[in-house]
């Protein structure tokens, strides 16, 4: 069946103003604004209330010493304790730091084992500095090679 191009153009021109179907507005996407985190906190607070946890005020900082020598440091910390259930909760943003970063204020918090580890750490640091100084002395005697430059003229 042949199609008359003039009639087709005329029909397209007439139907250009007619819209088929209704207007659709875009659905607004829901953004996750941390509601899942709030639910977890609410559940945690409810459980602590069941345990009759007591909030401890005026805690400046908390440090958890790890076996690998690093420290979990809580600068601004909230603490709740339920001693009858052997439960303690620490709230805050933890930062993983090296032991050296927290000196000298952390010395009073260290136990006997940590003080031994501290003396070993000091010995390791002294050895590392001695090795660096020895390495620098060796490097001064070795000239740097530059492409296109010869050292024969300097020797004579």
Curated annotation (Swiss-Prot):
BP terms from Gene Ontology: cotranslational protein targeting to membrane; mitophagy; protein transport
Protein name, UniProt field: Nascent polypeptide-associated complex subunit beta
One Pfam short name: NAC
Region (Disordered): 1-42, 129-156
Record's subunit section: Part of the nascent polypeptide-associated complex (NAC), consisting of EGD2 and EGD1. NAC associates with ribosomes via EGD1.
Family: Belongs to the NAC-beta family.
CDD domains, A to Z: NAC_BTF3
Gene Ontology CC annotation, any one: nascent polypeptide-associated complex
Record-linked InterPro entries: BTF3, NAC_A/B_dom_sf, Nas_poly-pep-assoc_cplx_dom
Repressor as UniProt keyword: yes
Localization of this protein: Cytoplasm; Nucleus
PANTHER family assigned: TRANSCRIPTION FACTOR BTF3 FAMILY MEMBER (PTHR10351)
Function statement: Component of the nascent polypeptide-associated complex (NAC), a dynamic component of the ribosomal exit tunnel, protecting the emerging polypeptides from interaction with other cytoplasmic proteins to ensure appropriate nascent protein targeting. The NAC complex also promotes mitochondrial protein import by enhancing productive ribosome interactions with the outer mitochondrial membrane and blocks the inappropriate interaction of ribosomes translating non-secretory nascent polypeptides with translocation sites in the membrane of the endoplasmic reticulum.
Source organism phylogeny: Eukaryota, Fungi, Dikarya, Ascomycota, Saccharomycotina
Assigned keywords, A-Z: Cytoplasm, Nucleus, Protein transport, Repressor, Transcription, Transcription regulation, Transport
NAC-A/B domain location: 38-103
Gene behind this protein: EGD1
Gene3D superfamilies cross-referenced by the UniProt entry: Nascent polypeptide-associated complex domain
Keyword Ion transport: no
GO molecular function: unfolded protein binding
């Amino acid at each position: 069946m042949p199609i008359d191009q003039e009639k087709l153009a005329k029909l397209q021109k007439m139907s250009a103003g007619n819209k088929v179907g209704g207007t659709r507005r875009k659905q607004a996407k829901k953004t996750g604004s941390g509601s899942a985190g709030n639910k977890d906190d609410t559940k945690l607070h409810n459980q602590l209330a069941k345990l009759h946890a007591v909030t401890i005020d005026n805690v400046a900082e908390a440090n958890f010493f790890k076996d690998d020598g690093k420290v979990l440091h809580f600068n601004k910390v909230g603490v709740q304790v339920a001693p009858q259930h052997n439960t303690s909760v620490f709230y805050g943003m933890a930062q993983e730091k090296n032991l050296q970063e927290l000196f000298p204020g952390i010395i009073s918090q260290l136990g006997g084992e940590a003080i031994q580890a501290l003396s070993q750490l000091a010995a390791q640091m002294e050895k590392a500095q001695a090795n660096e100084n020895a390495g620098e002395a060796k490097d001064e005697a070795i000239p740097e090679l530059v492409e296109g430059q010869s050292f024969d003229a300097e020797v004579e």
